[in-house]
Amino acid sequence: MTTDTHTLHIEEILELLPHRYPFLLVDRVLDFEEGRFLRAVKNVSVNEPFFQGHFPGKPIFPGVLILEAMAQATGILAFKSVGKLEPGELYYFAGIDEARFKRPVVPGDQMIMEVTFEKTRRGLTRFKGVASVDGKVVCEATMMCARSREA
């Protein structure tokens, strides 16, 4: 457990998110402010299983997984802001608008994801997400997420 309340290491992330290898896409939280924003990192390794087929000889991190990594970051922000999931609750990726991919992400890149809380309405929370590598935007999107009891 860290002593700095604005960073989270993998052990703390595993306590918050239900995701596990190979689908856990957040390695560390660099900074956050409850109810406002969170900045996290995904270290992109050539050992990721999807690189075998995406694409042979020219590995590119799938854009849909960039979006998933940002969605996982919203989950961490939500759980740090309003509490962890209770038994029987799920946190859903409910929608996406204005997704744009600006440049490819490749093995060896360190992808920084910043998600910002925008608003909650009718059980949906809207976040703005931006992913970057070396200070250059690789993806941006508006994401909607919902927290609810299992059906």
From Swiss-Prot:
**According to the lineage, what is the superkingdom?**
Bacteria
- Write down the EC number: 4.2.1.59
| Localization | Cytoplasm
Listed under catalytic activity are: a (3R)-hydroxyacyl-[ACP] = a (2E)-enoyl-[ACP] + H2O
Q: Which InterPro entries does UniProt cross-reference here?
A: FabA_FabZ, FabZ, HotDog_dom_sf
Q: What class of enzyme is it?
A: lyase
Would you name any one GO CC term?
cytoplasm
One Pfam match: FabA
Q: Which residues form the active site?
A: H54
Alphabetically list the UniProt keywords.
Cytoplasm, Lipid A biosynthesis, Lipid biosynthesis, Lipid metabolism, Lyase
* TM stretches of this protein: none
Q: Which GO terms are recorded in the biological process aspect for this UniProt protein?
A: fatty acid biosynthetic process; lipid A biosynthetic process
Q: Extract one GO molecular function annotation from the record.
A: (3R)-hydroxyacyl-[acyl-carrier-protein] dehydratase activity
The family note in this entry says: Belongs to the thioester dehydratase family. FabZ subfamily.
Known role = Involved in unsaturated fatty acids biosynthesis. Catalyzes the dehydration of short chain beta-hydroxyacyl-ACPs and long chain saturated and unsaturated beta-hydroxyacyl-ACPs.
Protein's UniProt name? 3-hydroxyacyl-[acyl-carrier-protein] dehydratase FabZ
Gene that produces this protein: fabZ
